Amino acid sequence: MVQLAKVPILGNDIIHVGYNIHDHLVETIIKHCPSSTYVICNDTNLSKVPYYQQLVLEFKASLPEGSRLLTYVVKPGETSKSRETKAQLEDYLLVEGCTRDTVMVAIGGGVIGDMIGFVASTFMRGVRVVQVPTSLLAMVDSSIGGKTAIDTPLGKNFIGAFWQPKFVLVDIKWLETLAKREFINGMAEVIKTACIWNADEFTRLESNASLFLNVVNGAKNVKVTNQLTNEIDEISNTDIEAMLDHTYKLVLESIKVKAEVVSSDERESSLRNLLNFGHSIGHAYEAILTPQALHGECVSIGMVKEAELSRYFGILSPTQVARLSKILVAYGLPVSPDEKWFKELTLHKKTPLDILLKKMSIDKKNEGSKKKVVILESIGKCYGDSAQFVSDEDLRFILTDETLVYPFKDIPADQQKVVIPPGSKSISNRALILAALGEGQCKIKNLLHSDDTKHMLTAVHELKGATISWEDNGETVVVEGHGGSTLSACADPLYLGNAGTASRFLTSLAALVNSTPSQKYIVLTGNARMQQRPIAPLVDSLRANGTKIEYLNNEGSLPIKVYTDSVFKGGRIELAATVSSQYVSSILMCAPYAEEPVTLALVGGKPISKLYVDMTIKMMEKFGINVETSTTEPYTYYIPKGHYINPSEYVIESDASSATYPLAFAAMTGTTVTVPNIGFESLQGDARFARDVLKPMGCKITQTATSTTVSGPPVGTLKPLKHVDMEPMTDAFLTACVVAAISHDSDPNSANTTTIEGIANQRVKECNRILAMATELAKFGVKTTELPDGIQVHGLNSIKDLKVPSDSSGPVGVCTYDDHRVAMSFSLLAGMVNSQNERDEVANPVRILERHCTGKTWPGWWDVLHSELGAKLDGAEPLECTSKKNSKKSVVIIGMRAAGKTTISKWCASALGYKLVDLDELFEQQHNNQSVKQFVVENGWEKFREEETRIFKEVIQNYGDDGYVFSTGGGIVESAESRKALKDFASSGGYVLHLHRDIEETIVFLQSDPSRPAYVEEIREVWNRREGWYKECSNFSFFAPHCSAEAEFQALRRSFSKHIATITGVREIEIPSGRSAFVCLTFDDLTEQTENLTPICYGCEAVEVRVDHLANYSADFVSKQLSILRKATDSIPIIFTVRTMKQGGNFPDEEFKTLRELYDIALKNGVEFLDLELTLPTDIQYEVINKRGNTKIIGSHHDFQGLYSWDDAEWENRFNQALTLDVDVVKFVGTAVNFEDNLRLEHFRDTHKNKPLIAVNMTSKGSISRVLNNVLTPVTSDLLPNSAAPGQLTVAQINKMYTSMGGIEPKELFVVGKPIGHSRSPILHNTGYEILGLPHKFDKFETESAQLVKEKLLDGNKNFGGAAVTIPLKLDIMQYMDELTDAAKVIGAVNTVIPLGNKKFKGDNTDWLGIRNALINNGVPEYVGHTAGLVIGAGGTSRAALYALHSLGCKKIFIINRTTSKLKPLIESLPSEFNIIGIESTKSIEEIKEHVGVAVSCVPADKPLDDELLSKLERFLVKGAHAAFVPTLLEAAYKPSVTPVMTISQDKYQWHVVPGSQMLVHQGVAQFEKWTGFKGPFKAIFDAVTKE
């Protein structure tokens, strides 16, 4: 029964804790805080809670005469905790006439409590405040102790005061409506207080974790009627009464700790900062991961890191760290920023080491630049009575998974250390199985606390095999075995990580598990490596004995499904045990529970690691079952039926494999190490390592029955071991390898070789350990030779020969392959590098990757190496963070034959500047130029697929990061191994692009192509089979329709080039910063609308595809629509929108499966923007956000019903949600009921500027909001059948309305120069103004005088908006410019004058843009780095041409001219990096090796070409034949429309030619954009300019 409890703080019983105490709450406030005015303050979310409404009504009813109750509601979220909100509340209090006797009642979470407390501390120089916390975090933390504050833009809680409340009234009932994640978030502070102060409460929390999580996870959303407004609200509801006693106690006990600490240290001078345990590091993570991560989640990670820091210092035991980590996980909190679910929640944000340390430096506990951290001594007790100083070096080590090991230089030769390794993994796992199957209680001591045993304990618990509890502050595990009778199938898969021992033992145990009415099987699974490790021999034996087992993925490996309604028969069982002795132990331990006595016969050769089998048999004997070894049959055992009887206590011997590392440290450093609890009586084979390996290598060994001491010889005098059979201790071979690496002798013929055999099983451990050692030793300069069942290590002549692992780019890390033994072995060798150098020599450390993998067997190894053995360690930013910046991930193109892979691969390579490899051609090169078709005829498809896979894996391995395009054969996806390789490459950041087109067109084409191998089956069947594989293996796709004309072909090329540039990040997707718009398409099929799509998009920065309006949602149809749109609009950015019905669209609200598929199509097609509704299920939102790649996300919310005014909390909540999701743009659409709704919207817009915001009102009353919206305003077009939303306007309508409001000022623009009578500039610009509804006017100003232009226009026309400058003023006008663009400076002329305001002007030149954009628009890639350029002529325009070709990436530009003497001064006047080569003679052209694919003619067009110049030109035109794209020549002259240069280029040499009219219009459109900020409607302008 929950009683009202009162907790004293600072000498007063003011903290009251209870359940459903609203009567007491009202009575306490009114009785003990008499006042004329009570002010209840809360946020709008709390107003929806019935319990709050009940409290307000009761408060009103209980007011004494002469008192009044005011309520003040603020918007929810951290943004309300501001100076502005505080000021608004203070103004409200003053207006309402509140005086010094006012009592503030803060009802809410930490934001409300902090802010209202601060208002109370300053209003009228301090009024009374009562805290009524409603969140768990507020109840146990922020409401207690009197800390109040607000946030500023420079940091949280920087402005505030200590102001103790009169009461803190804690009612557990508030937690019923607390959201699940907030509930779990609060548990971090609860666990923290128990951790630092109350060990008994920590133990109680441990035992109630599953109850808590079950109840909290069972929370449901319910609809309730608001008692104050009669509105229907939806709130979360948790069944608190199902865990009321636990919740009450956890809140009460946590409050007691904080109250006691605050009472001792109110102003946080010493003891109170112990409450900051987990916060020093946690706050640093929070600073980076906010708002995605919550405070408690970051503190949880911080607690684990700070506990690991204490363990690193040798203060906290590994067991205590494991307990803390386990309890946090049990309550649903993260323990590492790298947990998969937490990374997805925080949107894969990086937490760089330097940023974390920088954030940690801003901490009130610090003293100057010295950082302080709370150090834990044990669960329930801190080290010292305040935080301790910690170095950045130690923090770096704790905060990263990459470790720097410095040379073992300062370790004294006479050092003697005693090291106790953790309990044996092998014995720990066996003891847990035996105790779970046994009857009675068994106290297991020195159990290894590691990933392996954690998985085993979890499995035993989930299978209800035993009751598990802890004693001795978690050091002793108490197993209450039930004799196997309670083993029951569990519904969830048992995840075992990379725990091979647990997986093998549990496979046999699964055969003894009973079915339940709802569950007839169990699933065992693990991580990626576990799903490669073998388990087949064990499964085969169990299957043969009657247990039904299925493989769920790879044959012979986890995951497996074990059916629990089959039986473990017993009798004779044959088992192949040449790979792992764990198979044998697994069956041995479960055999007594079979239906019949078991005879276990080991077949297939000599069993591996027989000592481990002997260990199992000896342990079974301790638990009451005697195994008899056959005297007549080798390797055969008899196991009787029976039950284990648990010994009252079982002490786990230390792990002998782990003991090899400190013992080897002694050997390598010439020091002495003693392991006091492993001797010659050990059950473990690895106990022989010191005697059989280190002693013959020159070490002094002292071994008793229970201890081992190793003293190493002087450093550098270890001897190689000619031969050692390590079969009895296979896991120790890695340690032997690193010792052998620095062993040498005086025999010139020995090559310092140590030969190790008997370890073949080590190839199928956590990794292929023999290969791993060979690979990593080579990085240190140590050579090895692999043997069939072992390895030879060729030691170095001197330790000084050891190298720091590095490559051409600098130091590299030692890869540990997620293998604990690899990591620990190389931590020793790493310290020997440079250890013999002079003391003052700077020595580079060795980097070890993935240090946390040692957690499998020795989580505290690094702590022992550092604190016990004296090694200097540091942490470092992961190498991949720096190396990946420089890598150029390759592109793999897959798809059916005839999908266009060969052509598009060339385009791809050209667009990115990558190298191209056709894998079919590479195949032929590697097979003596035999064609694929011939190879298939001779060897069959299966052999070809094997070779194809091998080649693919090789090129990815060697060139996956080096900027290649790999064009594959259509059938590469037929091979499962190839599919895996493709998926692995995609998941590593590579680009796998699925190229596809209409299958019917493909079939027609393929049936008529004799050059390709014949299909055995019909093409359609092949497509049906492969289609899913293509989609599964690719992370991007491109729909490439067949092209029937060259113009279509070039349009497709431009479309693809922009697509590939977008998905690879070469082309950045920009969110417009100024006024901009997107048009909303409402067609059901774009196929028939291609002619209209360009004019529909005039004036827009993006186009929205309303997918919910499309005729069907199939992947092919939708992809085709995107392709059509890109091609027709020259790849204007696409907004991909699927609008659901409840958000005003056509898409069914609950069709989430189809919705996911559509979003997948969008992201694979690399759409620039994706509209994500904020009302969708959270899992869909996070899935899209985490897969978005370069796509920008628009978080949208629409109020079609007009339910919410713009000052309603709904919009604030949705905006905060959008911030949490970290969308790129927020889009809110309301409904204007009256004109005032637009004013409220503008206030909202004005106060929400931290994300680009599209905010508009629907209906005609809301039109003004569309005019005032300044980023990506949704618009319609007169060419659309209907608008996408009520009240939508066209771009022209918006501009005209905005002009009428004074938003756009009418400008006068001119073309200046002489003669300009025939200038097309006025019609060019005025056409654009008319179409876009702009008020400007473009006219002619004819003059030869730049002075006159300055007087009349620059100085004399107040409406001057810009000038297009033509001859003869392009040079003269420059003197009047205040700024010149780079283009104007280099080209040496100005053709565009841009007003900057205040009578200042910028001179620009857009001729080069006219050239560049005209070329790109005609199929020239945006980057042509592998092609040279050519300029014909050396006049003024040639400078713009050279500038343009350089901007396209031409590495070399040739220039020819009739008068060659003009070339040299021209070239010398331009930057040397343009690499311009002037051609003096025709002969020199023959020696040019480069392909020339792009040219610009700048010679007069009205005269015939000089013969010499013509000869040079023709020799260059020949060089276009082998360019990577259709060679293209631009004619700079506008008239005549066809020039002599164009004729000869096109007719004789098949160059594509571009008329000068296109350059004219492109440069004019560039001017248009610079002057107006709008993209010019190119097609309409071009038609107007060229219509005569």
Curated annotation (Swiss-Prot):
InterPro entries: 3-dehydroquinate_DH_AS, Aldolase_TIM, Aminoacid_DH-like_N_sf, DHQ_synth_AroB, DHQS/DOIS_N, DHQS_C, DHquinase_I, Enolpyruvate_Tfrase_dom. One of its GO terms (cellular component) is cytoplasm. Residues 405-871 are annotated as: EPSP synthase. The active site is at E268 (proton acceptor), H283 (proton acceptor), C853 (for epsp synthase activity), H1198 (proton acceptor), K1227 (schiff-base intermediate with substrate). Keywords: Amino-acid biosynthesis, Aromatic amino acid biosynthesis, ATP-binding, Cytoplasm, Kinase, Lyase, Metal-binding, Multifunctional enzyme, NADP, Nucleotide-binding, Oxidoreductase, Transferase, Zinc. 7-phospho-2-dehydro-3-deoxy-D-arabino-heptonate binds at residues 125, 141, 147, 157, 189-192, 258, 272-276, 279, 295, 364. Binds 2 Zn(2+) ions per subunit. It is found in: Cytoplasm. Residues 890-1080 are annotated as: Shikimate kinase. Residues 1-392 are annotated as: 3-dehydroquinate synthase. HAMAP family: EPSP_synth (MF_00210), Pentafunct_AroM (MF_03143), Shikimate_kinase (MF_00109). Homodimer. The AROM polypeptide catalyzes 5 consecutive enzymatic reactions in prechorismate polyaromatic amino acid biosynthesis. This is Pentafunctional AROM polypeptide.
